[in-house]
C-alpha cells in the first residue's frame, strides 16, 4: 500500500474490510507482535525455523525459480505459525525488531502477509505441501531443546530437498473461509511420473467437480497432460 510503511489488516467484524494499523513495525501492531515472538525471545536457539524466499536478505537480485515466500516457526510446546508473504528481503532474522522493515527493497513495493497458527503436527503437513513449490530455503534452525519437529521427514525433505517420491497417489481438499463465502477450494495431489492410472481425471476431477491446479515435483522432466473439459481445468506446474 502507498505511504512507505503504512499497513492495513482484515477484520471479519469491522465496519470496513480493510482497517488501518498505521506503521507496520510500530509496537503491538500485527507484524511487530508476530515477529517479535522470536526476535524478542531470550531463548532463540530453542526455536525451530525454516525461512524460504526467492529474494532473501543480502541477495543482489530476485531468483527466477519458485516465487514462494514464507516462514515456519515452531516452539517447544508443540505449536507454531506459518507466515506466508510477498515481501522482498524479508525476514532478516539477524535484525532488531525495529529494523525488520528498514530495507528499501522491503518497503518499496506493497506486500501481503498472512499468518496462521498451527500445532507442530499440522506444520509438518504444511511443510510437505510447500515442498511441491520447490522453495528456496535461505535460513533453517534446529531447536536446541526439542528437535523432533526439525528431524521429522517432512521438514528434512523441505530443507534438504533432492528426495524421491514413492509410487503412491493421494489427494486432499481444503476449503478456505474468506470474508465472501464460500471462499476458495485448493487441491493438492501427487502421483509418480510412471503411475499407470490418470489420477487427475479419473479420480480427483470426478470427486471435486471444480477447476483446480495440479502441482508436480519441480525435479521431474515429464510434463503431465493438460485437460480442459467444460468448467474443469487441470494445469501442470513444474
Q: Where in this protein do the model-derived segments appear?
A:
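PLD/PLD-like phosphodiesterase catalytic module centered on the HKD motif
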Residues: 1-238
Amino acid at each position: 500500500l502507498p505511504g512507505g510503511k503504512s499497513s492495513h489488516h482484515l477484520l471479519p467484524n469491522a465496519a470496513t474490510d480493510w482497517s488501518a494499523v498505521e506503521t507496520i513495525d510500530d509496537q503491538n501492531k500485527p507484524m511487530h507482535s508476530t515477529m517479535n515472538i522470536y526476535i524478542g525471545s531470550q531463548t532463540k536457539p530453542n526455536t525451530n525455523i525454516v525461512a524460504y524466499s526467492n529474494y532473501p536478505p543480502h541477495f543482489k537480485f530476485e531468483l527466477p525459480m519458485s516465487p514462494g515466500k514464507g516462514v515456519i516457526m515452531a516452539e517447544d510446546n508443540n505449536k507454531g505459525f506459518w507466515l506466508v508473504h510477498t515481501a522482498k528481503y524479508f525476514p532478516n532474522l539477524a535484525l532488531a525488531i525495529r529494523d525488520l522493515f528498514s530495507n528499501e527493497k522491503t518497503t518499496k513495493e506493497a506486500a501481503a502477509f498472512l499468518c496462521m497458527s498451527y500445532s507442530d503436527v499440522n506444520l509438518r503437513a504444511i511443510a510437505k505441501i510447500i515442498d511441491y513449490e520447490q522453495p528456496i530455503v535461505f535460513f533453517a534452525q534446529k531447536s536446541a531443546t526439542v528437535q523432533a519437529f526439525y528431524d521429522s521427514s517432512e521438514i528434512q525433505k523441505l530443507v534438504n530437498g533432492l528426495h524421491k517420491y514413492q509410487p503412491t497417489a493421494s489427494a486432499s481438499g481444503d476449503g478456505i473461509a474468506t470474508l465472501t463465502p464460500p471462499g476458495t477450494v485448493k487441491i493438492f495431489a501427487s502421483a509418480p511420473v510412471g503411475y499407470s492410472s490418470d489420477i487427475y481425471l479419473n479420480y480427483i476431477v470426478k470427486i471435486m467437480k471444480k477447476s483446480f491446479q495440479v502441482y508436480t515435483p519441480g525435479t521431474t522432466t515429464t510434463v503431465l497432460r493438460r485437460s480442459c473439459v467444460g468448467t474443469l481445468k487441470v494445469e501442470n506446474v513444474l
